[in-house]
Amino acid sequence: MNIKDVGVIISKKPLKENTFIITVCTKNHGLYSGVVKESSKKSKFIYQEGNIVDFLWQARLHEHIGIAKCELIKSYTGYLIINKTKLYAFNSIISLIKELCHEREKHSNFFSFLLNYLDNLSKNFCFRDYINFELTLLAKTGYKLDLTKCGVTHVTTDLTYVSPKSARALSYEVGKPYKDKLLILPKFLLSDDSEITLEEKRQALTLTNYFFNRYLFHNNRQPEARQTFVGYILNEG
């Protein structure tokens, strides 16, 4: 059987000499892995993580790993490797996709969201965009946070906390008696205009980190690339 799609290469692992297994996040078919051969300098350039490609997958049976062929559409590599923050953010994002998105599981609209993020990241790193990507990944895996209104009173003002149980925002008055048991809702997630302080970055990463660990990563074993990114942002970024 054959599958043709457009996708982003998110993983490349050596199999044997000049042969690799790539994983591609496709537009219409979810994650797909296939064996590729690098027979020239051109093919080495094509099969790089972050490249957007026309993707052809062929196998006798659907459950086989299959043979893959790609044609390059666009490469972001040159924009990412020259900036440590961009590179760490990119590595973190694709490591999360590999961990949280299952092979051949379709996610509607996720591909366009990923493309938009990569395009923006290639131009400039934005912490707000990064956190929104993590929140989107949580939502795509079934753990959407509702930060638009208070989960108790439904008011949309003075939102200050997030309940670790319901994943819903809480107003200051509702959450105050239980503040030691609640997560902080960073102000920048409520307004596109506000500047982001280092403390708010810490709060945001703590927020997504909590739900990643509670629902998706056993024994708090997150991808090393995300840990590297978080450490860099909180100490350098």
Swiss-Prot record:
GO cellular component: bacterial nucleoid
Domain of life: Bacteria
InterPro entries given in the database record: ARFGAP/RecO, DNA_rep/recomb_RecO_N, NA-bd_OB-fold, RecO, RecO_C
Alphabetically ordered keywords of this record: DNA damage, DNA recombination, DNA repair
GO biological process, alphabetically ordered: DNA recombination; double-strand break repair
Pfam families recorded: RecO_C, RecO_N
Parts forming coiled coils: none
Keyword Cytoplasm: no
The family this protein is said to belong to: Belongs to the RecO family.
PANTHER family: DNA REPAIR PROTEIN RECO
Function: Involved in DNA repair and RecF pathway recombination.
Protein name: DNA repair protein RecO
